[in-house]
Amino acid sequence: MSVLCLGEVWLELNAAAAPELTETFRAQTGGWGAGFCRQYAALGGQAALLAQLGADPFGRKLAARLARDGVDCSLLCFTDAFPTPVVFTGADTALPYRAHTAGLALGPEQLETAPFRGSSAFCFSSAGLVDSPLRLAHLEALAAARDAGT
């Protein structure tokens, strides 16, 4: 079964303590869409991720990690207009830096290449339904998936 996932990807910087109490962070791939696709691929499934990253070192690193983990990254979009989101986590603390970032700027015009007809399932996170271009992309993607019978 092939799955098309519309979701977010961000660089997650994890620490064992609260961010203000540590000097060391571990960089990981974060975001519901990225996590879902990585796990689905690890179980032997085919998962394509439709998301947008900044055309920056963080975005390129995350795309390379996703591809290495077996995720189909052919639908990833990159933009120079916004940076890749970053989230700091540690000791029951989450500090998201998502406002005005690439993931939320993904718009409906970027859905044209999404292969809804070739997918067995379409999944998304309700977190993408915030007031942003990403919300409009979700609404159009849901209509396209319904029309394709996905």
PLM regions with names:
Residues M1-S2, P108-P115, A137-D147:
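Short amphipathic alpha-helices and their capping/turn segments at secondary-structure boundaries
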Residues A121-T150:
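Conserved beta-alpha-beta core of the PfkB/ribokinase-like small-molecule kinase fold
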Residues Q46-S126:
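Conserved N-terminal subdomain of the carbohydrate kinase-like
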Residues A34-Q39, D80-A81, A127, T150:
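Short C-terminal domain-edge/linker segments immediately following a structured domain
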Residues M1-D72:
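Glycine-rich phosphate/adenosyl-contacting loop at the front of the ribokinase-like
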Residues L13, L104, V130-S132:
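Short glycine-rich, flexible loops that bind phosphorylated cofactors or substrates
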Residues T29-G30, L104, L134-R135:
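A conditional alpha-helix N-cap/helix-loop micro-motif detector
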Residues T24, V86, L139-A141:
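Residue-level signature of transmembrane alpha-helix interfaces in integral membrane proteins
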